[in-house]
Swiss-Prot record:
Protein name: 4-hydroxy-3-methylbut-2-en-1-yl diphosphate synthase (flavodoxin)
Amino acids binding [4Fe-4S] cluster: C304, C307, C350, E357
Entry EC no(s): 1.17.7.3
Pathway(s) annotated for this protein in UniProt: Isoprenoid biosynthesis; isopentenyl diphosphate biosynthesis via DXP pathway; isopentenyl diphosphate from 1-deoxy-D-xylulose 5-phosphate: step 5/6
Cofactor binding: number and manner: Binds 1 [4Fe-4S] cluster.
Alphabetically ordered keywords of this record: 4Fe-4S, Iron, Iron-sulfur, Isoprene biosynthesis, Metal-binding, Oxidoreductase
Family annotation (Pfam families): GcpE (PF04551)
Names of the cofactor(s): [4Fe-4S] cluster
Gene designation per UniProt: ispG
Organism: Rhizobium johnstonii (strain DSM 114642 / LMG 32736 / 3841) (Rhizobium leguminosarum bv. viciae)
Function recorded in the entry: Converts 2C-methyl-D-erythritol 2,4-cyclodiphosphate (ME-2,4cPP) into 1-hydroxy-2-methyl-2-(E)-butenyl 4-diphosphate.
GO molecular function terms attached to this record: 4 iron, 4 sulfur cluster binding; 4-hydroxy-3-methylbut-2-en-1-yl diphosphate synthase activity (ferredoxin); 4-hydroxy-3-methylbut-2-enyl-diphosphate synthase activity (flavodoxin); iron ion binding
GO BP, one annotated term: isopentenyl diphosphate biosynthetic process, methylerythritol 4-phosphate pathway
Keyword Secreted applies: no
Length: 416
């Protein structure tokens, strides 16, 4: 018979810890949130601004494209500018095709980066593949940098895939093409990792990723990787898409894998709207981890969805205002009020669930529904503290939330 305990998250898979510029990935450390810029890295001003925005939003690692000499030459300047802003955020260099040459020609870039990302599907072709892969690994050893061996099904090693397809065709019970492709993705990652270790890069300097664009494929390849190795794993659904579709797909895929104890760092690859905010991918990654109970980044604002009893929009506007204020203030509050991430706020729209939900929060309000008395009881630490009335209920409650934060978290120190 099943019990409630059967539905708890599986224990985290034991993986080898990797130090990425002071941020620990794997080894039981909290799952790390990372992101990627979409600026031209050679445009130093734009890249610094976007990295800074991503880091302020909560990205603990930021990946930048290093695709040509001008980009490689800009990397140490970007790093220096960020340090002057007080941002010691580890930068990951994303290399394709000519990474071996760029790292060799730009030693300052090789030193400034905290990690190198290698794609075994395009690091080199035919006879040059292993040689150019080895050159990047040797650079990582020389500069004591970790690498992510990132396999992507859109640029999968075609020689390996063809060999597996040919072997499968001769099998008595052949697998589907999709299943063979999954196996090729896994083998590409593991064979590349084995080669890197053979060259001399220790396992605690290697992170693996296997990126696909379909939810079921992400679940499959990462589950297989987790079973066959103890490398730290980077999760991400490549080409997840725009808006709701991208958020839902990433959440469904990574949520399942994380629930099974798999994954040491995540990136949500959302296609931004034209002129959209790149930090959205950071917020979604944080929310995936937070709603699943793995990490806490920001106070939770619980709000009811509304129904026929809540024809007023006051509770919706209040919930939105509080959520926006929290996000705006978190960079300061995180330093000023240690532990504020654990705060729970409830903004409810009527008497049915309002009082009960508000009692479960640290501070909550039950606004009057349609036809109810125009009064809003406020609950603090599980007890009714006061009742707000009049036209300024929303503003009064917002002030109470700030006052609660100052009193509860303001006396703490970061060491507590």
């Amino acid at each position: 018979m099943l019990s409630a305990a059967d539905f708890d998250p599986k224990p985290r898979r034991a993986s080898v810890a990797v130090d990425v510029g002071g941020v620990i990935v794997g080894g039981g450390a909290p799952v790390v949130v990372q992101s990627m810029t979409n600026t031209d890295t050679a445009d130093i001003d734009s890249t610094v601004a976007q990295v800074a925005a991503l880091h302020r939003a909560g990205s603990e690692l930021v990946r930048i494209t290093v695709d040509r000499d001008e980009s490689a030459a800009a990397v140490p300047k970007i790093r220096e500018r960020l340090l002057r802003l007080g941002m010691d955020v580890p930068l990951i260099g994303d290399f394709h095709y000519i990474g071996h040459k760029l790292l060799a020609d730009h030693p300052d870039c090789a030193e400034a980066l905290a990690k190198y990302r290698i794609n075994p599907g395009n690091v080199g072709f035919k006879d040059k593949k292993d040689k150019q892969f080895a050159e990047i690994i040797e650079m990582a050893i020389r500069y004591d940098k970790p690498v992510r061996i990132g396999v992507n099904w859109g640029s999968l090693d075609q020689d390996l895939l063809t060999a597996l397809m040919d072997r499968n065709a001769e099998a008595g019970s052949p697998l589907s093409a999709r299943q063979v492709t999954r196996e090729a993705i896994v083998q590409s990652a593991l064979l590349s990792a084995a080669l890197a270790e053979e060259i001399g890069l220790p396992r605690n300097r290697i992170i693996l990723s296997a990126k696909v664009s379909q939810v079921q494929d992400l679940i499959a390849v990462n589950s297989i990787l987790a079973e066959r190795s103890n490398h730290a794993l980077h999760l991400g659904l490549t080409e997840a898409g725009m808006g709701t579709k991208g958020i839902v797909a990433s959440s469904a895929a990574m949520g399942f894998v994380l629930q099974h104890g798999i994954g040491d760092t995540i990136r949500v690859s959302l296609t931004p709207e034209p002129n959209g905010d790149r930090t959205r991918e950071v917020q979604v990654a944080q929310e995936i981890l937070q709603v699943m109970g793995f990490r806490q980044f920001i106070p939770v604002v619980a709000a009811c969805p509304g129904c026929g009893r809540t024809t007023s929009t006051v509770f919706q506007e209040l919930a939105q205002n509080i959520q926006n204020d929290i996000r705006k203030n978190m960079p300061v509050w995180r330093e000023k009020y240690p532990g504020v991430e654990a705060l729970n706020v409830a903004v409810m729209g009527c008497i049915v669930n309002g009082p009960g939900e508000s009692k479960h929060a640290d501070i909550g309000i039950s606004l009057p529904g349609t036809g109810e008395t125009p009064a809003a009881p406020v609950f603090i630490d599980g007890r009714k503290a006061l009742t707000l009335r009049g036209p300024n209920i929303a503003a009064d409650f917002e002030a109470l939330v700030v006052d609660y934060i100052e009193k509860r978290f303001g006396q703490r120190t970061a060491a507590e």
